[in-house]
């Protein structure tokens, strides 16, 4: 456990929760938690960092401990998305007040363990899920086939699981980074 975790995540680990919000976690708490992981670069899309306007407000987490990977070579291991991408990703109805989605790259094996089928078979299962439901682990509506899962507004049912999946995704990103370094050295 990280010493600088938001208090809510610490409380959830020990089986307690804030009474005022039934265990819900804010997007700020998630951003602070993931940003506190070693080697994480956090980018919140904005006009100032020349991100496309459609992404403004969305947060992307990359593992780049040396902070030297070119931006066009960074792949996030998790994101926090706060609005729909019209024409691309609208099934979660993120334009509702107070709704955000945590997206986590769990990999093929993790995806299959969580959902019971491999990511490559997601299209056959797509209609089984309510992508607008809150506090439920679901396949990512657009990137499930690449091993991504999502939770809208994690709360009592999913906040502990989301934290663990974020930790696992970070560890997976670390391993991928180390493999890239090893490949360059051989």
Name each model feature, range by range.
Residues 60-143:
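Short, conserved beta-strand/beta-arch hydrophobic-aromatic motifs that form part
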Residues 129-186:
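Well-ordered alpha/beta subsegment
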Residues 33, 37, 125-126, 168-173:
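Conserved short hydrophobic interaction patches
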